[in-house]
Amino acid sequence: MTPVTPAAFEKRDNVVIFDTTMRDGEQSPGASMSHDEKLELAKILEEMGVDVIEAGFPIASNGDFEAVREIAKIVKNSTIAGLCRAHQVDIDRCAEALKGTQRGRIHVVIATSDLHMKHKLQMEPDAVIDVIARSVTHARNLRDDVEWSAEDATRSDRQFLRRAIETAIKAGATTINLPDTVGYTYPSEYADLFSWMTQNVEGADKVIFSTHCHNDLGLAVANSLAGVQGGARQIECAINGLGERAGNAALEEVVMALKVRGDKLPYETKIDTTHITRASRYVSAITGFPVQYNKAIVGKNAFAHESGIHQDGMLKNRETYEIMTPESVGQAPSSLVMGKHSGSHAFRAKLKDLGYELGQNALKEAFGRFKDLADRKKHVYDDDIIALVDDALARGSERIRVQRLRVVAGTDGQSAELTLEVDGEVKTSEASGDGPVDAVFNAIQQIVPHDAALRLFQVHAVTEGTDAQAQVSVRLEEDGRIATGQAADTDTLTASAKAYVNALNNLMARKEKSRPEAAIASGF
């Protein structure tokens, strides 16, 4: 494979979109994804037009290795990247995972700041330069597409960073990534860093420079765009801004900023923005991380107008208060109410409007659940259907299933009778508690003993009215592992039981993963 040169991208006025939802995004505490969920997300990202999909950290676990390998086999139009440290064994493992694709990228990372070299690597600068030369050379001998990342680049000595970049370029790197690992830099500083490097680094014209920004100060998107102004032609980002600590630059925000403000940043991406909402909802469903209502681009209120003045302006001309349309990011143009008399064809059309394309079996199951919901609710709104489909997606790998729940609550106490299916075996328990939710969770604890602590229990109504569905989020922590579960139901206690069980299933999945002794924890 011949790597595309920066000149080719400049000619097309393109910015490469590098998605790291499955790698850096999954490092967000509790954001674990199953193997099948990663495969489905990879398909969504490919359909969206993402240039590079970072599918995992192959040496971190067998699960990551298999995810990278399978995604490399099924994705044909996007480059698949695997992350590795600057160790030969890491690089070899990454190359092995990428064998199934002609569009594979080995992504090598090592820290370059004085702080990291002294305290984390415990290496002298000259030794780090030697490791860069050897590791990138080895990676380039295995793949033509090699990305090199300078962890903590924005806090690195500029002259040493230049030396490190030149070493990586001479060794064969085709993309140079300068991460703002701890979200410390300021837009003007980041733009200047890229401008200076592209002008002063020998061989800079032979590579693509990349941004990778964390959101610790809320500047990840602004810094990414500033990096492009300074000369970067690749942005590393994640759906919904998912990532370590405060997260990464949000893919949907950087893409729409480039699209809407082409007058200031005359660069294009290959992203089909009508897939954005679908991707956002899918990631939210499988990770259990709700999208905040006022989140830019994909939040529930992103295109909502309540002020009378705003509503009047919108009725006269939408452009008075909207700089983009809901349709441009894949949101349904209307909130058509459906009910128990709606047929499967109307349901399928509604799902398509909402950005969901389900297979025949999944569609049949979803329609059955819709009809059940319609029997319990007078009106079924778009948000109800979204919650219904997302609830199914969030279940993932189910070792534990809720079969039956009966709760008795009154002034004289609360008790729950619960039946679960655990690894194919049906088990029943009765428990009391300080409130009905506590009783339900105690009943689950009796059937599935565990030491996980409840860190989050959150309920919100999907729509208005007393028959509205309740959407429940639960977060559990055990031995430093965090897992989240979501569920929706017209019965709040049933939704609570399902969400808790989903979190337990995800916690079990996380336990099966193991990380190498020196695995990167920073998400660089």
UniProtKB/Swiss-Prot annotation:
Residues 401-524 are annotated as: Regulatory domain. The keyword Chaperone does not apply. Pfam families: HCS_D2, HMGL-like, LeuA_dimer. The keyword Manganese applies. Pathway: Amino-acid biosynthesis; L-leucine biosynthesis; L-leucine from 3-methyl-2-oxobutanoate: step 1/4. Residues 15-277 form the Pyruvate carboxyltransferase domain. Transmembrane segments: none annotated. Coiled coil: none annotated. It catalyses: 3-methyl-2-oxobutanoate + acetyl-CoA + H2O = (2S)-2-isopropylmalate + CoA + H(+). Belongs to the alpha-IPM synthase/homocitrate synthase family. LeuA type 1 subfamily. This is 2-isopropylmalate synthase.
